[in-house]
Amino acid sequence: MTSSIREWLNLSVRWFHVFAAIMWVGQTYYFTWLDGQFNRLEKKAAGDETPPQVWMVHSGGFYAVAKQKSLGVLPEQVRWFRWEALMTWLSGMVLLFLVYYSSSGLIDTDVANISQAAGIAIGLTVLLGAWLIYDSAARSPLGKSEAAFATFSLIMIAAISFGLMHLLSGRAAYMEIGAMLGTIMTANVWFRILPSQRKMIATAAAGAQFDASLGAQAKLRSKHNTFMAVPVVFIMISNHFPVATYGNTYACEILVALVLIGWGAAKIIREA
């Protein structure tokens, strides 16, 4: 592959990746905001069985959205939100291979004298291993406590960041953490949120009362995704600021601190 073709491929995939991410994160925060509005309206109208509506104005019209407790249309008429997450992850993985796994950007011999193959193996192991650890923790009693789970997650991110900063180049280590969080977010959508939603739709279509825990499980993973999205976006743009981020003497500490700041920002947005 010539350098010119590689550069255009890099640019095209990056463009696609950013736009897909905008669509995914945008809809995630939109529904997060909607849920917050519905919760406030339900508290005000305690005892009223009429589904509350959120009124909005956008472009050239007014919109009224109501949250339903039953399925009022055929299952095939329900709009799913899934491809945005998959397209974001797939394009991100292509970028990871283009920029790091198939180039010299992955390894820094001043950091660790390892082979390219070893670096790739480390990177892929982190992506899979982090999901398995996160998912196990989220399904355990630890996942029922927001403070305990947040503490565990921060320790996990800090430990993996520290390890990667001593094995890969600083830039690759940062992007690997971003890819790790993005992989967890996508796996949440496809392996936890969508299966719960399928069961909810199938049960509702059959005229039965669906298990409320299904919705709670999907909502919890969606909540986790809103907290991971902000640090991921930061990591995406960190490439442009090497002195302040991955090239800094305190690169690992800066990354962990900015994950915390990102979580704080996400909490503010969620409560707006």
Task: Tell what function each PLM region has.
Residues 1-272:
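Polytopic transmembrane helical bundles with strong interfacial aromatic enrichment
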